[in-house]
Structures are given as structure tokens and as C-alpha cells.
């Protein structure tokens, strides 16, 4: 036989030492090690296209450029402010490089190396440029440039090396950089007639390291202060990019954790007092509740990657659910004191009679939460495990501490409890078979409504991935609107253990996309291929050049130069390049230095599995065009992975369909087994399960009425409610084994109402979070708990009346 937890256990010194040690360790972990993570990849499934997005997020999300958007009414002021911001950021410790103009690689000594960086269209124009007519046309334009008033000695020098301006041809068309931002080589990133301008910076360090993200944001704030100090007014300066988004996400999550946890405590306390009607009981319940939450937070601090955006909801849920145990323990203490037991004996009695049902209820709820461990989303797994652990830890803390505090508070015998009048109304409504049938039909009505009306529509499964409240994401939208591009781009990943092979495959994708962009089959793309193609790609392109037999065209170039009035001696280097074209692959000077290093970081990364090269494609979202683009990409690189936040919607819906069934089945099975063991009756276990069916249907109706849509995060809370809300039915059915249903309702009705409302308060606190996914999760949880309470209070007495007769709830022989 299991020995009751409370018989002399708490006064033992070793138990006090353990509690103190665990509390001290949890406090240290909470304040020293607890951190939240801005890594949104924890919200994604780790399979299919979504797995590719997770890999991209972890490899590239840490290196995304910081984009500063400046806007004003006067272009001259915007330009001056941009120059000031760029100057400050170039001296900032958090910034590796700054680019306020599109890169313009210096021409090499051999201008025929232009073929190494030319895509299909540029190669065609290069071939035209080295014909006799093409040479004369380009030389006429070169002569005009040299005669222009702005021409200087530097321009004269490079035009002498490359009088045909061959090296300009790969970049003469607009070059696309991050997120489709276009600019001609050497030009500033401007829009709206110069009233909007971008400054692009390459941050140092990972965006997922809080100190790095904070440093970038602070340095941009210093740049804004420098603009104001220079007397440049009327300029708005805004920041977006990976570091800004990560920092804003972390601040939002910290705010949500603090607000939801505090609000949950306040709302649960108010619900407790309103239903339990004994304010002093809060003094006995809140300290162990805080203690159990602290222990759970200590466990959360051990998560290696920090708390995810969904997992931070554990605190509010644990507080709301944890009060349940306190309600039943303190009620048992009051009952023992009314029976004449001394405060100490009453504390031991309360612990002895409640430890088994409360721990069983906590275990059922904890297992229901832990069933989320079968989910394919890491963030949801963390939420389930933390809530499950918190449910058990708070129950243990309350069993240990609440009776001791209560024995001190209840020195005087409490007065008899005043009867709850609403219980008499409920008994009257379910006291006869006819009324019981009517009550059951009313509770079952939502099942029929859902069958006719249908389940709530599935909303965007990505609702929690891009929090609408984040200012850097709003800035990103403004950049799209001003400079072109659009959200929802595809991310095409070419991977290989060897970096050059991966880059070669990405170059092939870029060549396949170029004609599609010209035909407007896609809105555009940006690739590293134009600025830094792989050595293999460069050699292949130079082979195209060599097929033109440039040495045979040297004399044609010489004649064209002479006819156009150029000095042949000054252009001797260009003539020698035609006679002896370079055969080696070439990297433009500074390509791996400060000028283009951020472009390399945006497109090339490495992880444990090898090199990853990303190409960013903006589809036009026409099914036929998108299908053509996918086919072209996979034809160029059959091993490429096409992903993106919009592209993984199907993957998330698949996860929702699979996990909802799996998690629901596990939770329902465990709850059924627990009910059978606790109630020792098949019929009464079936009654408890019937309350769940009514609850689920009521949730469906409420979501339809309130306009709450299903998505992958709020849908998965529904199976968890099986374990959380079954408590109400279990306590009512357990009490009905020992007495009449009327007495059971009077004894347990107010208590289960208190526990349900405090649980609902915990979920409801999440509605005030700024994170979209948590708000919906909290709304569904709160609605579900209230629906479960109403179902239990009506279905249990009505069903027992029909099954066992009006007065047979106390007949122990009815157990099966």
C-alpha cells in the first residue's frame, strides 16, 4: 500500500534541504541562464521543404544584412543623412562593412575576362560588341565619355585599358541585390525621386546571439543621433534585417513572457477568490504556486537553444493549471478543521486525503501536455514538456507547502461553507430522467451544429512565423513597396560538400532564371553568379569567349580604334588582351573583402553537412508560371531544394493533420486509461469521455462564432485539453461514488468551477501576447476549458441520472 505523502514527510530535514537546494538552483538558472531565442526555425517542421528552410534559417539567418531605410521630403537632406549614417556605421564595432552604393568591380588588365561574369544575355551582347560594327558603336560612346566635362584621369586610364567597355556589359542591366533591391553599378540605392535611400551593412556575429543583435540596433541608434546632431531634420531612419528582427522578436517574447505570466497570476487569483470565496487561501496557495513555476522556469533555462516563441507560453499555463491542486488541498484542510481536527492534524489529514487524486489529476494533465512531444515542431514539443513538468512540479509544491501555511492561517475553526445556490439549480435541471435527457441534448447540440455548420476554417498555418507586431517586418514591407520586390520569395538551395561545386550548380540556376526574368515569368531574382561565379562557371564562360577567336579580331579592333581617333599606344593593353586572352579564372579585386563580403555572406554558407548556396527568386504567383519556374530550376540543378515561408504552407498543414491525429490519439488513450483506473467503472469512464466530445464540439462552434481559425499551433492545444479538463469530470464522478450526486455537486461543484476558471485564466492571459500564435493558442485554450467545465457540470449528473437512476449516484454496486 502506498504511504500517504503527508504523514510526517514535510518536517523531515532532508526534504527541506532538497526543496531549498532545488529552489536556489532554479533561481540562479532563471536569472542567470534563462534566455529567449529569436530563431524562428523552431516553429517549422523538420521535414520536406520546411527542413530546407530550417537549414537555410540556421545557416543564413545569422548573416542577413542590416538594411537602413532613410526617407525625407528633400533628396539632398536624405543623401546627407545617408552619408552620415554610412560614416558612423563604418566605424561601429558591430559592423563589418557598409555599402551605400551598388558594387562596381574594377576592370582587370584583361577586359576579355568580362565573359567570366556574363550570363546568357550579357554573353550575347559581348559577342555583338566584338564584331566590327559593334566595336565602332561602343567606341563612339567611349569617345563621348572621354570628352564629357566630368571625365577625369581615372576614367581615362580604365577606358584606355578597356576602350570597348567590355567589363561593364555584365552589369549594364540592373543588378539585383538583397530582396530585389535594384541599382546600376556604382549608383546609390534610391527610390521615390531620391526621397528614399538605403544603406546596407554587414553585421558581425550571429543574429541569434542576443548581444550581437542588440549591438547592431544600438549602433544604428547612434547613427540616427549623429544625423540629428548634424542638424539634418525631417528624416525618418528605420532598420530591418536579420539582427533587427531577431532583437525585436526577443524583446517581444520577453514582454509576452512577463505580461502573460503576471496576468495569469492575477486573473487566476481573482478567479480563485471569486469561486472559492476565501481570500486568505491565496496566501497558502500562491507561494507554492510561484515555487513550482520557478522550478519549471529553471528547467526551461536548461534548453540549449533558449525558449522559443511558442514555448514562452508555459508560465501562464502552468500558473493557471497549477492552482487546481491548491483548491482541492485547501478545501480538504478546511473540511478537516470543521471536523474538529487541530491545525497540525488538519494539515496532515488534507495531505493524506488529497495527494492521490490530485497527483493523479496532475499526472493525467502532465501526460496530456507531454503528448505534444510527438509533434513535429520543436517549439510545440518544448511547450508540451515544460507545461507537463510544471503541472507536476506545482502539484508537488502545493502538497508540500500549502497544508503547512494553511494550518497557520486556520488557527480558528472556519465557519460552515455557505451553499452555492447555483448548484441547487443545476441539480434541479438534471434531477429527473426527462430533465436529464433535455440537459444532455442541450450539451450535445454543438455536435449537431458542427456537423451542419462545419469545423472552423483553417487559417494561415504560418500565422505564428511572421509576427505582425514587429516593427522591423513593417520596415521590410516599406522597403519592398519603395524599391520593388515582394514578400514570399522562394529560397533555392544548392548544396554540396564542395563549395565550388555547390556554387556551380547555383550558377546554372541563375542562367536558367535569366530568360524567365526577361520574359516576366518571374518578378526577378538575385544570385551571386553575376558578382562572383564559381571557378568552374568562369572557365565554361571563358570557353565561350575563346570560341569567338578573339586573336583573329585584333586587327579589326586596331582598325576601329584608329578610325575612332584613339591612341593605339595608349590602348596597347587592350590590343594585347585580344591577341592573348587570359585563360585563368578570375575573381574581381575586393570581391571577398569589404565591398562584396556581405553579398557572399548572403548567398554562401556552410554547416555540418557542407556548403549551401542560396538563390532568391520572386515568383509572380501564377500557377502556370510558377510551375515553369520550378521545372527550369530543377532542370538546371536536379538536387536543388525550393523552399520559403510561403512554400512550406503545405508542409505545415501536413504536420497539423498528422500531429493532431497522433497527439489526440495518445492523449485520449492515456486519459481513458487513467479514468478507468481512477473510477474503476467502464460506464463512468464513458461518461467522462462524453464530456470531452461535448467540449470539443462547443469549441468548434465558439471558434466559428468568434472568427478564430485553426492553425498548426492552436489546433494542437485541443488534445491537451483532454487531460486538463478531464479533472472536473473525474472529481465529480469520484465524489459520486461515496455519496449522492446532489451532495457531490455541492461538495465538488464550487471546487471544480474554481479550478476550471483559474485554468481558463491562465490560457486567457496569453490572449494579451503580441505573438500571433500565442494569442490564438490562449483563446482556444480558454474557450476549451470553459466548455469543458460546463460539459462536466451538466453531462456528469445528467448521464448518471439516466444510467443509474435519480438517486443511484451513491450506489456503490453500480460500478462495473
Regions found by a protein language model. Give the residues of each.
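Extracytoplasmic
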Residues: 151-279, 507, 576-671
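Alpha-helical transmembrane helix bundles of large polytopic membrane transport and channel proteins
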Residues: 26-28, 83-198, 212, 519-600
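Pore- and gate-forming transmembrane helices of large, multi-pass membrane proteins
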Residues: 286, 338-375, 739-769, 789
Amino acid at each position: 500500500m502506498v504511504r500517504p505523502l503527508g504523514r510526517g514527510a514535510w518536517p523531515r530535514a532532508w526534504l527541506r534541504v532538497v526543496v531549498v537546494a532545488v529552489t536556489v538552483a532554479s533561481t540562479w538558472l532563471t536569472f542567470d541562464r534563462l534566455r529567449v531565442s529569436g530563431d524562428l526555425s523552431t516553429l517549422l517542421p523538420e521535414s520536406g521543404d520546411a527542413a530546407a528552410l530550417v537549414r537555410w534559417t540556421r545557416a543564413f539567418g545569422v548573416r542577413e544584412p542590416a538594411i537602413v531605410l532613410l526617407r525625407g521630403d528633400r533628396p539632398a537632406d536624405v543623401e546627407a543623412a545617408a552619408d552620415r549614417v554610412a560614416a558612423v556605421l563604418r566605424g561601429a564595432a558591430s559592423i563589418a562593412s557598409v555599402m551605400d552604393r551598388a558594387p562596381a568591380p574594377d576592370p582587370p588588365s584583361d577586359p576579355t575576362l568580362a565573359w567570366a561574369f556574363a550570363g546568357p544575355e550579357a554573353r550575347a551582347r559581348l559577342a555583338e560588341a566584338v564584331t566590327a560594327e559593334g566595336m565602332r558603336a561602343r567606341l563612339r560612346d567611349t569617345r563621348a565619355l572621354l570628352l564629357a566635362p566630368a571625365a577625369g584621369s581615372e576614367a581615362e586610364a580604365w577606358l584606355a585599358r578597356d576602350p570597348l567597355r567590355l567589363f561593364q556589359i555584365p552589369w549594364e542591366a540592373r543588378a539585383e541585390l538583397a530582396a530585389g533591391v535594384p541599382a546600376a553599378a556604382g549608383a546609390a540605392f534610391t527610390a521615390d525621386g531620391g526621397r528614399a535611400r538605403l544603406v546596407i551593412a554587414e553585421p558581425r556575429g550571429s543574429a541569434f546571439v542576443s548581444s550581437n543583435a542588440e549591438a547592431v540596433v544600438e549602433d544604428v541608434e547612434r547613427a540616427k543621433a549623429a544625423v540629428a546632431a548634424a542638424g539634418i531634420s525631417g528624416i525618418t531612419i528605420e532598420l530591418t534585417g536579420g539582427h533587427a528582427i531577431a532583437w525585436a522578436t526577443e524583446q517581444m517574447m520577453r514582454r509576452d513572457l512577463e505580461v502573460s505570466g503576471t496576468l495569469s497570476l492575477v486573473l487566476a487569483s481573482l478567479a480563485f477568490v471569486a469561486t472559492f470565496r476565501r481570500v486568505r487561501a491565496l496566501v497558502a496557495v500562491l507561494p507554492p504556486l510561484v515555487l513550482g513555476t520557478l522550478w519549471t522556469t529553471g528547467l526551461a533555462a536548461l534548453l540549449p537553444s533558449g525558449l522559443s516563441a511558442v514555448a514562452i507560453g508555459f508560465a501562464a499555463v502552468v500558473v493557471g493549471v497549477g492552482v487546481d491542486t491548491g483548491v482541492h488541498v485547501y478545501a480538504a484542510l478546511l473540511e478537516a478543521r470543521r471536523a474538529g481536527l487541530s491545525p497540525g492534524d488538519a494539515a496532515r489529514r488534507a495531505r493524506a486525503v488529497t495527494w492521490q487524486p490530485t497527483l493523479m489529476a496532475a499526472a493525467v494533465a502532465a501526460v496530456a501536455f507531454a503528448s505534444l512531444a510527438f509533434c513535429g515542431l520543436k517549439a510545440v514539443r518544448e511547450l508540451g514538456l515544460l507545461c507537463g513538468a510544471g503541472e507536476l512540479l506545482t502539484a508537488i509544491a502545493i502538497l508540500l507547502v500549502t497544508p503547512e501555511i494553511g494550518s497557520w492561517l486556520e488557527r480558528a475553526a472556519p465557519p460552515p461553507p455557505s451553499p452555492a445556490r447555483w448548484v441547487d439549480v443545476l441539480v434541479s435541471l438534471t434531477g429527473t430522467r426527462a430533465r436529464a435527457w433535455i440537459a444532455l441534448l442541450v450539451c450535445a447540440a454543438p455536435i449537431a451544429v458542427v456537423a451542419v455548420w462545419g469545423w472552423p476554417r483553417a487559417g494561415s498555418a504560418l500565422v505564428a512565423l511572421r509576427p505582425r507586431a514587429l516593427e522591423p517586418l513593417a520596415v521590410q514591407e516599406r522597403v519592398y513597396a519603395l524599391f520593388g520586390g515582394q514578400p514570399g520569395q522562394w529560397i533555392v538551395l544548392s548544396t554540396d560538400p564542395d563549395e565550388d561545386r555547390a556554387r556551380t550548380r547555383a550558377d546554372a540556376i541563375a542562367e536558367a532564371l535569366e530568360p524567365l526574368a526577361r520574359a516576366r515569368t518571374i518578378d526577378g531574382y538575385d544570385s551571386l553568379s553575376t558578382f562572383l561565379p564559381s571557378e568552374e562557371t568562369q572557365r565554361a564562360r571563358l570557353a565561350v569567349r575563346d570560341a569567338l577567336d578573339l586573336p583573329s579580331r585584333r586587327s579589326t579592333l586596331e582598325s576601329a580604334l584608329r578610325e575612332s581617333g584613339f591612341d593605339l599606344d595608349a590602348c596597347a593593353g587592350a590590343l594585347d588582351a585580344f591577341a592573348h586572352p587570359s585563360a585563368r579564372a578570375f575573381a574581381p579585386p575586393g570581391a571577398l573583402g569589404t565591398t562584396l563580403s556581405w553579398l557572399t555572406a548572403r548567398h554562401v554558407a556552410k554547416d555540418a553537412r557542407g556548403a549551401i548556396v542560396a538563390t532568391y527568386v520572386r515568383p509572380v504567383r501564377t500557377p502556370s508560371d510558377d510551375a515553369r519556374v520550378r521545372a527550369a530550376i530543377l532542370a538546371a540543378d536536379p538536387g536543388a531544394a525550393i523552399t520559403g515561408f510561403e512554400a512550406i504552407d503545405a508542409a505545415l498543414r501536413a504536420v497539423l493533420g498528422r500531429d493532431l491525429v497522433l497527439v489526440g490519439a495518445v492523449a485520449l488513450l492515456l486519459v481513458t486509461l487513467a479514468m478507468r483506473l481512477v473510477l474503476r467503472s467502464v460506464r463512468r469512464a464513458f461518461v467522462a469521455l462524453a464530456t470531452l466530445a461535448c467540449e470539443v464540439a462547443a469549441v468548434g462552434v465558439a471558434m466559428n462564432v468568434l472568427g478564430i481559425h485553426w492553425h498548426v499551433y492552436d489546433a494542437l492545444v485541443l488534445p491537451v485539453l483532454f487531460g486538463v479538463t478531464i479533472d472536473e469530470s473525474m472529481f465529480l464522478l469520484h465524489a459520486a461514488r461515496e455519496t449522492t450526486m446532489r451532495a457531490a455537486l455541492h461538495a465538488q461543484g464550487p471546487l471544480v468551477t474554481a479550478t476550471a476558471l483559474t485554468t481558463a485564466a491562465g490560457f486567457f492571459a496569453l490572449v494579451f501576447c503580441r505573438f500571433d500564435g500565442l494569442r490564438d493558442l490562449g483563446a482556444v485554450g480558454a474557450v476549451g476549458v470553459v466548455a469543458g467545465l460546463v460539459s462536466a457540470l451538466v453531462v456528469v449528473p445528467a448521464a448518471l441520472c439516466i444510467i443509474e437512476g435519480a438517486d443511484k449516484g451513491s450506489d456503490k454496486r453500480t460500478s462495473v
